[in-house]
Amino acid sequence: MAPPHQFQSKPSDVIRRRLSSAVSSKRPNIPGYTSLTPMWAGIAGAVVNNNTQFEVAISIHDSVYNTDFASSVVPYSPNEPEAQAGIIEKHVLETLRKFSTEHMCKFLGAGVTVILLREAPNLCTRLWLDMDIVPIVFNIKPFHTDSITRPNVRHRISSTTGSYVPSGAETPTVYYDPAQLQDPNKLSANVQTRLPIPRTVDEQADSAARKCIMYFGPGNNPRLQIGPRNQVAVDAGGKIHLIDDIDEYRKTVGKGTWNSVIKLADELREKKIKIGFFSSTPQGGGVALMRHAIIRFFTALDVDAAWYVPNPSPSVFRTTKNNHNILQGVADPSLRLTKEAADNFDSWILKNGLRWTAEGGPLAPGGVDIAFIDDPQMPGLIPLIKRIRPDLPIIYRSHIEIRSDLVHVKGSPQEEVWNYLWNNIQHSDLFISHPVNKFVPSDVPLEKLALLGAATDWLDGLSKHLDAWDSQYYMGEFRNLCVKEKMNELGWPAREYIVQIARFDPSKGIPNVIDSYARFRKLCVDKVMEDDIPQLLLCGHGAVDDPDASIIYDQVLQLIHAKYKEYAPDIVVMRCPPSDQLLNTLMANAKFALQLSTREGFEVKVSEALHAGKPVIACRTGGIPLQIEHGKSGYLCEPGDNAAVAQHMLDLYTDEDLYDTMSEYARTHVSDEVGTVGNAAAWMYLAVMYVSRGVKLRPHGAWINDLMRTEMGEPYRPGEPRLPRGELHVQG
């Protein structure tokens, strides 16, 4: 091994002072904005000195050049693997933290070698949860290999179902002939004449750093990867390791939920059951977020699950968005589903479906054992599947509100769209809806109807805890975005702000948010010092299939400058890039949150805010009332009652004891059902019942989580948080 080597680059104290902004005197415990430079790292390790020490090398990269490297040794005890892993993890994290603070940088990603991961199995988990670094694992060997990625030589990735998509063929080892270095006559008898070319640990670390950067795209976000047959390669096909320590998932739920998950996963693995999800987009919307999280969790459980999306079509997405708005009752009354649009929609889904039903596809014989179909973009698949595989269980999942009162009005746009969709949906084995009043038309047989809320992941970028260093990086990034678009900037941390995070959609009640804020400002006169009045932040990022966002965004800005010009300098309106941690930070640093949707599905963003300890003021629409306990974790108002919203805003902002009590209650009373683990348990239960046990469920409007907990022998315990099971009239 080479002698230990320390980082050589020296940070500039002048630049450090210039970039660091002053900490607010009113809130000295919160760091100010700091401009941090994005960086990447490569981390490698190897046992050295006759198994007595472990060498760790770290290479620093700025996306163009290798800028620095360090290597050091730590004691090695092969007989104490857990203690040894802890030593390596601590050393790596301390080294990266020290470099970050000294050089004013933020590590976004790190390449980790398989050899190192074997010695420290939870290193990736710690990098992700403790330092907000995306860890990407590479099988970098301690000797040189010859890449087969050449012209006319194709890498192939598996087209079979499964949560792991291999990344290519094994590369051959490069050997050299010792005769090239010395006289072969001087070699002893029986000595191997072809030897591998060794690769030092620092070379391995540098290789890992360079490979890691290739997985990041515009905006420094990990690239979305789609495999053959449009299988979504979640976490870069398994190369990104966010959570290797499954115990981290266990900590997010109660004992009953976790015991149920383990029992279900054991049965699915034993029976080798393959699960398939089919939805319209691989990123940008709530459904996509849930699918990424659930596939990641299933991979950790070693449950065989895969997720497929169709080829995107802008013309079809315009049709599906129109259908969505029509069903929710927020579209222009003159907007209708034309025959031309319906035919285009049908041909699009048929074309994609034929790829999946063809030999070797996920919906062909030998493919998935159960199919979960998401939302009104995909029901055209259902009759096609039934023709090819009539015995395959098909579960339809509806994530949106369907205005059952309008659906049954003869000749209405809602009736036309619903009849078109129901013609396909009726062939499914089960219809799953949000547990919300009047979300399901009466056409759906009650025996086929089951209830399940939406979910979010407490360990992904949207909801995990971010420390102050990472938080200030994302707040700085948001400031830069505002400057770039010439938008008002947040005064945080000197000034508080109130936030609504939602898509720019006609149903999100954004005009009501602005009006409520204006009323709140008037109430603040003589009650709150002018410098202490909070700002308003409206932000969100959109789905791939949402063409309305720009239209609504423009309308919001026009409204502010026309009707609320007095308060315009204190209102920040931003369409954010697709960075989960950015939205996480904006929520975590807000005083409290609003969610004034006029029509809504479940809107799990409410639970994300509560989980972060942020009281929420929201409207009684969709699934929002299920998540907020009025007067305890937030306030519920009628849609359009902006005066009541403003008064609650004033109470929360001026009564510190009330705020602290609500914040703590919100943080500690979020149900397992709205997290990935509880949600995954419901899907696993359906797979076990339909496939493993051959039971065709007749839920009659029951909650899937209730059926699952009863079947697993893990009934809800007294005091266990869960969504209210009051009188629901889901069908209208």
Curated annotation (Swiss-Prot):
Keywords noted in UniProt: Carbohydrate metabolism, Glucose metabolism, Glycosyltransferase, Transferase
One protein family per Pfam: TreT_GT1
GO molecular function: alpha,alpha-trehalose phosphorylase (configuration-retaining) activity
Enzyme Commission identifier(s): 2.4.1.231
Maturation-removed propeptide residues: 1-25
Annotated signal peptide: none
Reaction catalyzed: alpha,alpha-trehalose + phosphate = alpha-D-glucose + alpha-D-glucose 1-phosphate
GO-annotated biological processes: glucose 6-phosphate metabolic process; glucose metabolic process; trehalose metabolic process
Regulation of its function: Activity abolished by 1 mM Cu(2+). 0.1 mM Cu(2+) reduces trehalose phosphorolysis to 76% and trehalose synthesis to 48% of maximum activity. 1 mM Zn(2+) abolishes trehalose synthesis, and reduces trehalose phosphorolysis to 40% of maximum activity. Unaffected by EDTA.
pH dependence: Optimum pH is 6.5 for trehalose phosphorolysis activity, 6.5-6.8 for trehalose synthesis activity.
Temperature-related behavior of activity: Optimum temperature is 32.5 degrees Celsius for trehalose phosphorolysis activity, 37.5 degrees Celsius for trehalose synthesis activity. Stable up to 35 degrees Celsius for trehalose phosphorolysis activity, 32.5 degrees Celsius for trehalose synthesis activity.
Family affiliation: Belongs to the glycosyltransferase group 1 family. Glycosyltransferase 4 subfamily.
PANTHER family for the chain: SYNTHASE (CCG-9), PUTATIVE (AFU_ORTHOLOGUE AFUA_3G12100)-RELATED (PTHR47779:SF1)
Quaternary structure and partners: Homodimer.
Summary of the function given for this chain in its UniProt record: Reversibly catalyzes the synthesis and degradation of trehalose from glucose and alpha-D-glucose 1-phosphate. The equilibrium lies in the direction of trehalose synthesis.
Protein name according to UniProt: Trehalose phosphorylase
Organism: Grifola frondosa
Lineage: Eukaryota, Fungi, Dikarya, Basidiomycota, Agaricomycotina
